[in-house]
Every structure is written in structure tokens, then in C-alpha cells.
UniProtKB/Swiss-Prot annotation:
Top-level taxon of origin: Bacteria
Provenance organism: Sinorhizobium fredii (strain NBRC 101917 / NGR234)
Reaction catalysed by this enzyme: squalene + FAD + H2O + H(+) = hydroxysqualene + FADH2
The keyword Flavoprotein is assigned to this record: yes
Name of the protein: Hydroxysqualene dehydroxylase
Keyword Coiled coil tagged: no
GO MF annotations in UniProt: oxidoreductase activity
Length: 417
């Protein structure tokens, strides 16, 4: 008789684990505490703009193979769209200067040898000085590893590392930053084409996974919050949802794919990150100008990245805790001013919405990175998943999928023994 796998949490980590286990033919049961699957990667209808918007502008790169394989498995890889080449346009709104970093289409970072493809006013030596980050340890600081000043840092390195680490780059883990650089910039343009979910995060990465699982007979229960894990002889024996208790057989497996605070509550003594950082996203109902760049890096203002979608302009601001206590009406006017300057547009403030993910990611410092647990727990049949676990990457969608796949592999190994 086939074993069962119970997955707690229907975010990207939980869904990726569920899809992989379903592909292997195992009965899968998914339980989600909220009313919507997707976790921090979801879409919703917003009445203020009268549009369906994402909670965040999650950017995928063509080299994120785990995300792309996951999308392929649920039949939506074509929904991840972007330019055919790895070209990143930027604007400095403090100087009105515009440029484009052209990473080419190969597997090597040969673009650094071509002046026209580099950041303006930078030399080859500036890029070579970044090399130490490639072999830096996770306990080292970015600020002690590479120069955190100068033109290259301000115009390229800082925007990329700020988006990846979601903390002030000099304070971030050089090891985590190095992992990002190795898998993107060092891998050449072939790995760096930016991709976004064309029809929204839920439509591309969440709902198709749920439908696939349900077609295969899996159960996906929403509004089903786990209250307690019961143990017997160092294995999980029962899932306590309050009014509903589910027995876990001796040959079953459980994957805990919930946020770190919930995991620590369910597993007393579990070490998890304790410091988090916010990401602020703003959405405007506004038709982008014809020929607008789908993704534009912005330097010299509050806005960091500007995304152009049909009927909508959207921005992302990382490490956004400094904005949380400022009235939204004040913040949105500063953001809209930056959008107009960066996008070359004008007009009164259109219908808008601001989405603040207060605990968007763990703080990617060496100290917090050291608190990330691996997937194995003290219970033989219980495994952890989540972008906050020890994936070797900062908190990203790629890390989420990797952690889910890793937990699924361990569950498969356990149920096959």
C-alpha cells in the first residue's frame, strides 16, 4: 500500500514538494492555514485599481532552473516571459543618465571586456575587484569582501544585491551574495534573462499546481491551520488542526513548509531566523508608454525597479522597513514622482495600491543565515522546507523550489526504506 505524505503549507515550497511527490506516484495531502495558496507568491483582485495584482514583483532569471522546471512540471513555463537577451536598462533619476548593461547570450561573462556593454564610466579592473565574493564564506560581510562604493557599485552591484539580499548590501552575507553572483552574472547572459509571470503569480505558479494535484487525487485544504504536531517514538504520529485530527502512519512522511515563526512554534527548540525585512510594492493603473522597458532599474531615488505590465506600472522597494511608519499617501506621491521621472511620463496620481510584505524575507546577514536549519529534523519522518531554511541562497523563489524538492527527495527516501 502506498505511503502518504502530508505537506503543511501551500506556498511555493510546499507546492513544489507536492508536485514532485505526486510525479512519483505518492498520495499527497496539502494543508494551508490561509484562504489562498501561494504564500508570499500570490495574486489578488484589488478594488482600488480594479486590477488583479501580485503581492510582489518576483523576478525570475533564465538560469533559475528549479523554478523553470517547476513551471514546466505544472504546464506553465510559457507563462514566464521576458526579453530574448539579457539586457538590463537603467536610469539614474538624480542625473537623468540612462544606460544599458548587455550581458549577451553566452555562458561566460565576456560582456565585462566590452566597454559598450558595461556600466558607463567603469573599467575592467572594477569588475575584477568583485572576484573575492565568489569564494567568500557565509559568515563574511559583503562590506568586508568587495568595494561598496564607486560607480560600478552604485549603478549595478548595489541594485542587484539589494534586491537579492533584501538588506543593505554591506551588512549582508558575502557567501549568499556570492551564490547569487555565481549563478547569474558569472554564468553569462544565458542565465540572466529576466522573466516575469505574464498573467500574475497565482495564474502561473500557484493555481495550475493546485489543479494538477487535485486532478491526480491529491487533497489541498485551505483555512486548515496546524495547531500541534504529536510525536511518538521520535516520529510524527498525529496532525492536530483543532477540530480535526489526522493520524500519521508509521510509514507516512510530513513536510513542514510554513514560515519560520510558525515552524518554531510547532517545533519547540528549532533554530530559525529571527530578524526579517520588508519589501514594499506599489501598483498604478496606468497604461505604459509604447515601447516601455518591461523592467527598468532605477538609481538615485526611492524606487529601485520599475515594471511595465498591460494597464499597470509597478515598482519594488527592498529593505523597506523605513517606509512602514510613513503614511501611505506620502509614500505613494514620492514613488509616483520617481515613476514619472524614470518612465518619462507625466500625469496626476492614478489609482494606486501599496502592498507591504512586512516579513518578506529573513535578514540575509551572516548572523541570521547561521540560524537557518537544514531539512532534517529530530523526527525521522518530518522534513522542513522554505526559502528561510538552509538553501545556500537568500530568500528567493528559486530557493523555495529547491527546498521543496529537497524535502520531497528526503520524504521519498524515507518512505522507500
Amino acid at each position: 500500500m502506498p505511503k502518504n505524505v502530508h505537506i503543511i503549507g501551500a506556498g511555493i515550497s510546499g507546492l513544489s514538494a507536492a508536485v514532485q511527490l505526486s510525479n512519483a506516484g505518492l498520495p499527497v495531502h496539502v494543508y494551508e492555514a490561509t484562504q489562498q495558496a501561494g504564500g508570499r507568491c500570490r495574486s489578488f483582485f484589488d478594488s482600488a485599481t480594479n486590477l488583479t495584482i501580485d503581492n510582489g514583483n518576483h523576478l525570475v532569471l533564465s538560469g533559475n532552473q528549479y523554478v523553470r522546471n517547476y513551471a514546466r512540471a505544472i504546464g506553465t513555463e510559457s507563462g514566464l516571459v521576458g526579453p530574448t537577451s539579457a539586457k538590463f536598462p537603467f536610469v539614474d533619476i538624480s542625473t537623468v543618465q540612462r544606460w544599458q548593461v548587455d550581458l549577451g547570450g553566452g555562458r561566460l561573462p565576456t560582456w565585462v571586456f566590452h566597454k559598450a556593454r558595461r556600466v558607463p564610466d567603469t573599467r575592467l579592473w572594477d569588475y575584477l575587484k568583485l572576484a573575492p565574493i565568489l569564494w567568500a564564506g557565509a559568515d563574511e560581510l559583503v562590506g568586508n569582501t568587495i568595494p561598496c562604493n564607486g560607480t560600478l557599485y552604485r549603478r549595478l552591484v548595489r541594485p542587484l544585491l539589494l534586491a537579492a539580499l533584501n538588506c543593505d548590501p554591506p551588512e549582508g552575507s558575502a557567501g549568499l551574495a556570492g551564490a547569487i553572483v555565481r549563478e547569474t552574472l558569472l554564468a553569462g547572459g544565458e542565465a540572466c534573462r529576466p522573466l516575469v509571470a505574464r498573467d500574475g503569480l497565482s495564474a502561473v505558479l500557484v493555481e495550475p499546481a493546485v489543479k494538477l494535484l487535485e486532478r491526480r487525487g491529491a487533497t489541498v485544504r485551505l483555512s486548515h491551520k496546524l495547531r500541534k504536531l504529536a510525536k511518538s517514538a521520535e516520529i510524527i504520529s498525529e496532525l492536530d488542526f483543532g477540530d480535526d485530527k489526522i493520524a500519521v502512519g508509521p510509514d507516512d512522511a510530513v513536510i513542514l513548509a510554513v514560515p519560520p515563526r510558525a515552524a518554531a512554534t510547532l517545533l519547540p527548540g528549532l533554530k530559525t531566523p529571527t530578524e526579517f525585512r520588508a519589501v514594499v510594492n506599489a501598483h498604478f493603473r496606468f497604461d505604459p508608454p509604447v515601447g516601455a522597458d518591461p523592467i527598468l532599474g532605477v538609481v538615485g531615488g526611492l524606487v529601485e525597479w520599475l515594471f511595465a505590465y498591460p494597464q499597470r506600472l509597478s515598482v519594488t522597494i527592498s529593505n523597506g522597513d523605513r517606509l512602514l511608519d510613513i503614511p501611505r499617501e506620502e509614500v505613494v506621491r514620492v514613488i509616483w514622482r520617481d515613476v514619472c521621472e524614470a518612465g518619462g511620463i507625466s500625469g496626476e496620481l492614478p489609482p494606486w495600491q501599496i502592498v507591504c510584505e512586512r516579513r518578506a524575507t529573513f535578514q540575509a546577514t551572516p548572523e541570521q543565515n547561521a540560524l537557518r536549519p537544514g531539512p532534517v529534523t529530530g523526527c525521522k519522518n518530518l522534513f522542513l522546507a522554505g526559502d528561510w531554511t538552509a538553501t545556500g541562497l537568500p530568500a528567493t523563489i528559486e530557493g523555495s523550489v529547491r527546498s521543496g524538492n529537497r524535502a520531497a527527495d528526503l520524504a521519498l527516501s524515507e518512505t522507500n526504506t
